[in-house]
Amino acid sequence: MDFDVLDYVAERTSKYILSKPKDMRKSLGQFFTSKTTARFMACLFSFPQKKRVEILDPGAGSGVLSAAIIEMIDKYHPEISQIALTCYETNSDILPLLAENLDYIKRKARVGLSIEILDTDYIISQADDFSGTISASPMQRKFDMVIGNPPYFKLAKDAPEAALMPEVCYGAPNIYFLFASMSLFNLADNGEMVYILPRSWTSVAYFSCFRSYLLHYGKLTDVHIFVSRKKVFDNENVLQETMIMKVRKTLVVPQTVRITSSVSSTDFNEITELFVPYDVVVSGNEQYVYLVTSEEEANVLKKVNAFTNPMPSMGLKMKTGLTVDFRNKELLRNNCSDNNVPLFYSQHMKNGRVIFPIGKENEYMSDELPGMVQVNRNYLFVKRFTAKEERRRLQCAIYLANQYPMFKKISTQNKINFIDTIDNSEMTEELVCGLYIVLNSTLYDMYYRILNGSTQVNSTEMNSIPIPARRDLERLGRKLIESGDYSTEYCDRVLEEVVYA
């Protein structure tokens, strides 16, 4: 090549983006890949040692990712002399630009390049093949490499795409993980796909079907994490937790996953690199994917995952607070009376204890709706939402019923979670205090931050996290009761002494 074709395609893409209003682009789920991100993605492939390769770019847009991978082959892989490129793109407005860009690449490239642009729906057009119906094609095309930045928007539960891929869907799916599933299906055995996508799929029950499919038929080999949510997409003011993953289509589990990280897509020359055992990155029955960025974080996972019992196995469960206050304003009260119960908010959680009342507006509510009240018994409260800049994600407070003997019932606002027993018995004070030490520790706070990059504490995820045995929890609790020290430093020290000594 006389010069970088990716520069040419990226420049023309920038002009196209700036000519369109953002709401139009967002409605199509199009967030165009930056040039540096595309080049980094292309570098991740282990290029097959053969003369002819088949490449798929689903949701090709203007062809930035296609340009990046072709440029990589043209410059650094002389053993490859022929490329068969297939692009899917349904946006009629950008199809002419895609065709022009690919034609330019074909004229400039050293390699022989055959191009097929399909303007059909990537998911619907292959639904029979994916599901293995009687209408499936007997000769399904498979690819050596797939490179993708899929569209990003939610589909309705009854959308045809969702109905056609029930194996990976749960509820109203996001189109991006249908694209990723179909791309894995399109790969030849031992083929590789490199995708940029939100990191939300790595945890949460909503994505369990997708994770099960992806991690059964494919295996993660590389993950790249962006520390900043900015500067990933070109000329787009997009704020979302984003990652790049490389998946090989194989049933063989690799020993390690290479995890890299950078501040943004403009500094790939300054990345951190870590090789983490596969069973540390992909762990548990839910197959959560833990995105560690340091040896310290890898050790955190090993220490916590050494336990085998999540809370439900001990008869405990974290639940979400019962009352959405702004939707039930007619039930809220400022004063206590015979038919009112205390309504606990996150503001009542102070330094590990529950302080009530604090003179806050609407601290009480009517008890007329049974579904919004709960028995006054011992609980551990955990904030459901924290600010991004806050030092801790897990923020807990011990609620002891004997401190509020005047109430038979209480209520919890929807922005806090609480840990309770499954059989509606009462936790002992020692058990509640032991749970506090565990969840208030630095170890478990780091663990949850690795598991979930968001600021929300998800009860389903918390119920899957392994914790110490009940007898150890009660020993920890007795230590806390004796000391009266609710600090994180004390929790860290006692957890180490009692559980890890």
Language model features by range: what are they?
Residues 90, 122-124, 349:
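Hydrophobic pocket-lining residues within nucleotide cofactor-binding pockets
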Residues 78, 105-111, 213-217:
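Short, conserved catalytic or adaptor-binding loops enriched in Gly and charged residues
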Residues 1-81, 86-104, 126, 150, ...:
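Class I S-adenosyl-L-methionine
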Residues 112-122:
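Conserved SAM-binding strand-loop segment of SAM-dependent methyltransferases
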